[in-house]
Amino acid sequence: MAFKCNEPAVPTLQQEDKTVRITRWDFAPGAATGWHTHSWPYFVVMLTDSVMKIEAPDGAVSEVQRKAGECYQRPAGIEHDVMNGSEHPMAFIEIEIKRPEELVRAK
């Protein structure tokens, strides 16, 4: 089940080609992405200090404090809904690696 929210998070595509997709996500307080699955491994770079609430497929909700500039990565196949649990806007950049083999230079 997805978080109940009055407003969805806003994705803004920054760059996309055959190897990567880079998206900026902006969340008003209480906004959520909606339930989704990541097809590719991805990295997140936080743009704001925030409280991120994450709902897992089993319904468990975790609450994580994130700092601006903090980064983390996750593998492909992650299923979740992400909500801004802060009282202020939350933003991050998501970098999805669509074809990692093409990012490696031939020797």
Task: Locate predicted features.
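Short histidine-centered beta-strand/loop micro-motifs
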Residues: 12, 25, 33-38, 55-56, ...
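Ligand-binding loop in jelly-roll beta-barrel domains
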Residues: 76-100
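Glycine- and acidic-residue-biased ligand/ion/polar-headgroup-sensing regions
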Residues: 38-58
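Histidine-centered metal-chelating micro-motifs
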Residues: 30-33, 69-83
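Extracytoplasmic/periplasmic copper-protein system
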Residues: 103-107
